[in-house]
């Protein structure tokens, strides 16, 4: 029996169980994708338009090509049978998946550990404030330790509103986003791709899932908006193939 048939272990490994410790109404959680990957030259060669997989952090566990809005030719379904055997594979593609990785170091040379890409992304908005930046890491040993383990809380702490359930987060008071993070020449795209690359390079199960998507077009579902094409993730898939 391998890890892909042992669903409870696999589920806990990626932290996709529904019993989260925080008391946030997940249905009212903010939009999951804040930075849309910008396509580069030849990115259209990373995928085929006749196979489209759509996902987000609460995706239904449907066979490849049978999720809402997905596309797959009938004759190609057999190419994704192995992927379909993995429970909740779509959720693993989300930034919210708990796929711990190491990336970056502090001034003493200690590696930063991150619970998810979501944590890494939001932390890097606040490199101007070391204490708040480090509160997003698993190295954190302060009052934000719960947040450092929970992607939904990380989104709330690092989001534009800086609120949890309508209440201002005290730790955000007076802390502003780095001026070089957003904008035409901002770091946001680079940071997101760095996080994705570390996630898939350091997590063998996440890597396996990504590779099993083969040449499918990967689109992240965003609440009340159009899908976001995950060009960066597909670039990494190409690197790993």
Regions found by a protein language model. Name each.
Residues 10, 15-26, 30-241:
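Charged, low-complexity intrinsically disordered segments
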